[in-house]
């Protein structure tokens, strides 16, 4: 933070202006709750991934194919990173995640994005789970993302996530 302030001061000095700042808010980093994650992982394994149909796979392939070459290259790289190069063609042919990826407390992936859940996590136990609701490698903030959120794929993902969250809440209270 202090480096950013120094950069702003330097810019003001270079332009013959002045600067001041007021720290009105800050966001705390995300604090994973491993105990809740272990409960949710067991519930996710029990509920299972959404059950996709051939029509779902066809629709997902259409969305995947609609990305430009640069995005498709990034998606291929992401698939290789998650599933391994030996499964690339399999995943591309059926580009909906049909697996529950087991929780590994030594391998917590925090993806980019903006959220205030870090602040919440310091006040109350917080859990973040991920369920497929769009094609593998989907690119956020695109028309493809918007369209997929209104599709049967997203509806199945939503229902599956709801079951996982409900079962996790029940198991947490038991």
Each predicted region: which residue ranges?
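Metal-dependent amide/peptide-bond hydrolase catalytic core
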Residues: 1-174
């Amino acid at each position: 933070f202090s480096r950013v302030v120094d950069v702003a001061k330097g810019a003001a000095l270079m332009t013959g202006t002045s600067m001041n700042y007021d720290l009105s808010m800050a966001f705390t980093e995300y604090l994973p709750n491993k105990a809740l994650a272990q409960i949710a992982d067991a519930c996710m394994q029990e509920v299972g991934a959404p059950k996709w149909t051939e029509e779902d796979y066809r629709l997902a392939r259409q969305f995947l194919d609609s990305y430009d070459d640069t995005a498709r290259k990034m998606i291929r790289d992401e698939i290789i990173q998650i599933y391994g190069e030996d499964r690339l063609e399999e995943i591309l042919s059926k580009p909906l995640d049909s697996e529950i990826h087991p929780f590994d407390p030594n391998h917590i992936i925090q993806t980019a994005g903006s959220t205030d859940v870090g602040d919440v996590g310091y006040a109350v136990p917080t859990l973040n789970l991920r369920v497929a609701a769009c094609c593998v490698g989907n690119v956020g903030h695109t028309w493809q993302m918007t369209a997929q959120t209104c599709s049967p794929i997203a509806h199945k993902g939503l229902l599956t996530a709801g079951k996982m969250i409900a079962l996790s809440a029940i198991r947490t209270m038991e």
